């Protein structure tokens, strides 16, 4: 239920009406929306195909957009990409979220973590880089439930990918006790990835020609909010939002 937060690109021509800009302290590279992340849906793509995902706030949306910011001599940001999460959970999790909304955000009295009930499926966890000469490029890991159980019995693909990263980070912390506070982007990726490698499944890196306008199928063309789309630049944030902003 936390607000949707994202790194905000310098190329954006439009901003949601309920957006709040960080303009006082720090790098001022983010915006947040006055609505829950789980109710902020965006179009995205993974190797299995196009998805709709939630903008669940995550630290890397801040740190990656900050690291990729280019500033002029006066300190003004002249280049920054928009960076946000697009998280598509399982059908059961989406149904649970719907129940939570119907309960007016009062948490269900009973919770459970699905594990042994999972009979099939795969986690596809990666980064989708968009707007360059290749149009899009997805790089990340893919781990099925069967592969996860063959690595560590009784675990799911989600928990194993997270645990592998935590193990790798702890190994780096033990070996680097004087480095102070660091974010994931600061760590030596080659050694961290090598330590996490046994737990994260197949590494996949390949181009895609997907963009948020290419596959749209508007059921009521000429009506509604389709006129709000920016057909001159597919990489505008409004083109990713679902439904299209009014």
What feature does the model see in each segment?
Residues 1-246:
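C-terminal catalytic/substrate-binding lobe primarily of soluble NAD(P)-dependent oxidoreductases
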